Regions:
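Short beta-strand/turn micro-motifs composed of small residues
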Residues: 7-9, 40
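Cell-envelope/extracellular polymer assembly enzymes that use nucleotide-activated donors
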Residues: 2-4, 35
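Short, well-formed alpha-helical segments that are part of the catalytic scaffolds
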Residues: 12-27, 46
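A conserved acidic beta->alpha catalytic loop
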Residues: 40-49, 98
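Short helix-capping segments at alpha-helix termini
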Residues: 27-32, 54-59, 87
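Acceptor/aglycone-binding surface of glycosyltransferases and processive sugar-polymer synthases
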Residues: 65-82, 88-90, 99-128
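Short beta-strand/loop segment that forms part of the nucleotide-sugar
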Residues: 32-43, 63-65
Length: 128
């Protein structure tokens, strides 16, 4: 099973680094391919290049927004990117500031807590 965790970030790279460490430490016994996609919301603070080998995170990608769009737009952009460019079974959005708890990732996967939605490209139907 392929799981993508998407994390919007604006300037707080230290919290993002802490979150990645927490995610890596909390998915030890999961038998799934877990990747992280960070959405940089046009941060004004430089990101410290930190080369770290994570034992359990399969890959980390950074999507860079050209201008600051806000939290919701970052999530929407990442979801569009994941849908169009990545193979996945589940997507878990997490805040980069540590508000969301990485130890709950297992619960989402084990209990398959999901949200399903339909997207209409042109007009929303009158009867849903």
């Amino acid at each position: 099973m392929k799981i993508k965790i998407l994390v919007p970030i604006y300037n707080d790279w230290q919290s993002a680094s802490n979150l990645l460490n927490d995610i890596d430490n909390n998915i030890l016994d999961l038998d799934h391919e877990l990747s992280v996609i960070i959405v940089n919301d046009a941060s004004t603070h430089d990101r410290q290049e930190e080369q770290k080998d994570f034992k359990n995170i399969h890959s980390i990608k950074i999507l860079n927004m050209k201008i600051n769009q806000g939290h919701a737009r970052c999530i929407a952009t990442a979801l569009k990117y994941i849908f169009e460019k990545e193979e996945f079974d589940y997507v878990i959005p997490m805040d980069g500031d540590g508000e969301d708890r990485p130890e709950e990732i297992k619960e989402f996967i084990l209990f398959k807590l999901i949200c399903d939605f339909k997207r209409y490209k042109n007009n929303t139907p009158k009867n849903k």
